[in-house]
Amino acid sequence: MRALALDVGLKRIGVALCVDKKIALPLDAVLRKNRNQAANEIKNLLKIHEISLLIVGIPKGGSREEEMTRRIKHFVSLLEFDKEICFVDESGTSKEALGYGVANTRKKDGKLDSLSAFIMIKDYFAL
């Protein structure tokens, strides 16, 4: 069983992979030029890694929660993923990712976003 976690943002999408509910690792983030380009890159990952579960972070709380949730769910619909999709609370994952000390917050390369996705998948499977 393979799962992919997404931390969907307006400029970058953090991505993490979990294999057999045992091994999880962050992947390179997808840098968004537009929705269709980003959706196609994620579709490719779903196919290449033979994903059976998609875990997607949704913000809980905050003034823009409703708008971001709508945007994220619209993006997920573009993936045309016909297997299980689970939306999870992503609150605090970026702050926790900063604690790993790996991501350079000045660089906008998506490492922090993928670490956030990694934390979501780690928490989902209690790894």
Curated annotation (Swiss-Prot):
One of its GO terms (biological process) is rRNA 5'-end processing. It is found in: Cytoplasm. Transmembrane segments: none annotated. Keywords: Cytoplasm, Hydrolase, Nuclease, Ribosome biogenesis. Its EC number is 3.1.-.-. InterPro entries: RNaseH-like_sf (IPR012337), YqgF (IPR005227), YqgF/RNaseH-like_dom (IPR006641), YqgF/RNaseH-like_dom_sf (IPR037027). CDD domains: YqgF. One of its GO terms (molecular function) is nuclease activity. It is an enzyme of class 3 (hydrolase). It comes from the Bacteria. GO terms for cellular component: cytosol. SUPFAM superfamilies: Ribonuclease H-like. The keyword Acyltransferase does not apply. The keyword Hydrolase applies. Belongs to the YqgF nuclease family. PANTHER family: POLYNUCLEOTIDYL TRANSFERASE, RIBONUCLEASE H-LIKE SUPERFAMILY PROTEIN (PTHR33317:SF4). Could be a nuclease involved in processing of the 5'-end of pre-16S rRNA. This is Putative pre-16S rRNA nuclease. It comes from Campylobacter jejuni subsp. jejuni serotype O:23/36 (strain 81-176).
